[in-house]
């Protein structure tokens, strides 16, 4: 397995698909990286030479934020919004959907497991 940006990418898949295993690289960005490195997108990772792998590593590390750096930046952005108490920050603090989704009947994933509410007390006759 080749190792790029501290991620083991699978050998038996096409290069474009393998690059998407790296956090922060989607199909479009993977294709763009292949074009910059002048490597065929259909080439499998196990067919790459050492020089091509080094070229890919250099392009990814110098021009793109991926893996740890990107995760850290996203976390800091969320923390900043929480600190300034903007609307999105408050939604993060309350563990509710941030981008305007409905919460009346949905958002179970974001809100967590449903909490049972005690039923009405039976009247004594």
Curated annotation (Swiss-Prot):
What GO MF annotations does this protein's record show? rRNA binding; structural constituent of ribosome; tRNA binding
Record keywords: rRNA-binding included?
yes
Q: Name one GO biological process term.
A: translation
The answer to whether keyword RNA-binding applies is yes
Q: Which residues does UniProt assign to the signal peptide?
A: none
- Please provide the record's keywords in A-Z order: Ribonucleoprotein, Ribosomal protein, RNA-binding, rRNA-binding, tRNA-binding
State any GO CC term: cytosol
Pfam families with a match to the protein in the record: Ribosomal_S13
Top-level taxon of the source organism: Bacteria
Q: Which family does it belong to?
A: Belongs to the universal ribosomal protein uS13 family.
Q: How does it assemble?
A: Part of the 30S ribosomal subunit. Forms a loose heterodimer with protein S19. Forms two bridges to the 50S subunit in the 70S ribosome.
Tell me, what does this protein do in biology?
Located at the top of the head of the 30S subunit, it contacts several helices of the 16S rRNA. In the 70S ribosome it contacts the 23S rRNA (bridge B1a) and protein L5 of the 50S subunit (bridge B1b), connecting the 2 subunits; these bridges are implicated in subunit movement. Contacts the tRNAs in the A and P-sites.
What is the name of this protein? Small ribosomal subunit protein uS13
Q: Which organism is it from?
A: Rickettsia conorii (strain ATCC VR-613 / Malish 7)
| Upper lineage | Bacteria, Pseudomonadati, Pseudomonadota, Alphaproteobacteria, Rickettsiales
């Amino acid at each position: 397995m080749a190792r790029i940006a501290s991620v083991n990418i699978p050998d038996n898949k096409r290069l474009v698909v393998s690059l998407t295993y790296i956090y922060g690289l989607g199909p479009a960005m993977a294709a763009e990286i292949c074009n910059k490195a002048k490597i065929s997108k259909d080439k499998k990772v196990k067919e790459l030479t050492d020089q091509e792998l080094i070229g890919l590593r250099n392009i990814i590390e110098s021009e793109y934020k991926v893996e740890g750096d990107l995760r850290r930046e996203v976390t800091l952005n969320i923390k900043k919004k929480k600190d300034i108490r903007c609307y999105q920050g408050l939604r993060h603090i309350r563990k509710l959907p941030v981008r305007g989704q409905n919460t009346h009947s949905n958002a179970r994933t974001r809100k967590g497991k449903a909490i049972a509410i005690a039923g009405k007390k039976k009247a004594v006759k």
